[in-house]
Amino acid sequence: MNFHGQGHGNRSRVIRCLVQAARDALEERANRNHGVKVGGVHNLKGAKTENRRGLIEQPDGVKDRDIHGEYTVGHDDPCRSVFDPASAAEENLKIAGSEGVLESECVRHTTSKLQCMSDPLSGLLAALDLTDTGARTSEDIFTGPSQWQPLGRVFGGQVLAQSITAAIRTVADDRFIHSTHGYFLRPGDSDKPITFSVDRIHDGRSFSTRRTQAYQNGLPILSLIASFQVDDEGLEHQVSMPLDIPDPESLPSAADTLAGIDHPVARNWATQRAFDMRHVTSPVYFSVEGAHVPHQALWFRAIGSMPDDPNLHRAALAYASDYSILEPILRAHGIAWGTPGLKAASLDHAMWWHRYSRVDEWLLYVQESPTAKGGRGLTLGQIFNRQGELVASVAQEGMVRVPSA
């Protein structure tokens, strides 16, 4: 569903209705599988529209994955046929109409209606609508759903944004996140919910610090520390936004680029992302065109209007920042996401919020990889709004392995 043709008020109402539908679907799953209920719609500070809440138990069992996030498909795994880079390289992609196919594949591979919602933005909002379990020991405990992914792995940006959201829910309203540093410890299973524990490490006069651990099956999949600060005055300067960048309206979207490719992962990139991503140079989905350089730029924004909660936009910015951050490493070596045998996974993620900006307005993401060595690569990113303000800075190291020739 695309909201760009609707007025702001109508889009907001549609989003709210879709989020409520998402929460209803999540509750239905909890009732069916675990006999408990999960709560109503929250903003990131926890104001809720209804009083039902509960804890989703973690189902047993995990797929065969190593600590760095590589995914090994078992013989009886229904996702085996979803994506195989080698088959893609062997021209197993067909040009055909594909409307509705991805959703049916999702329904076939998971019991979660929430994960198969036709509008990805409502799915993102529902994923960030964490349930406060009410448990108060030494930590605050929240739970949240996972969004369906064709490879069966939780998107790193999702668990990152959810962990940030959990931390936000435990600080005073006058304190805003300004930095976070997180480590991806294990891959998450996208067909299972996630539990988040928040340790209130420190509250000072100006700063607060929180540590969030994200768990599945009793094991941590992400460990994150976030810092918050009250609004303050001080020195100001910033780097300039690059010149001669074409406007996003003049660039093709992922949906345009991948239109007609009859392949689950291509359809997921084209239609199941909550953000419209538009590369300034050609994207690196299945091939690398142009110079093999360690840098790129792209525009992105949410596919529809989002609620006005600034904390929601900050968390969603972290979500989107993980989409393409490893691509400069690939581009430098002429490697595409569809390269046979490619194994790539995020190892850590650091982010600094400098100035507030909405994520349902166009943002420019400038990325550069200064080095790659030992099966790891580092990328640095800067996010600007259309007014040229530096909104955020990002750094991520990732594992990138390509079979030797």
Where are the regions a protein language model picked out?
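Intrinsically disordered, low-complexity segments enriched in glycine and mixed charged residues
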Residues: M1-G61, R65-H75, R80-L93, G97-G100, ...
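Intrinsically disordered, low-complexity segments enriched in small/polar residues
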Residues: N2, G69, S104-V107, H181, ...
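Flexible domain-boundary/linker segments
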Residues: R29, G39-H42, G46, D66-E70, ...
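Cationic, low-complexity basic patches in intrinsically disordered or flexible, solvent-exposed regions
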Residues: P59, C106, L114-C116
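Terminal targeting signals and extreme-terminal segments of soluble enzymes
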Residues: K113-A405
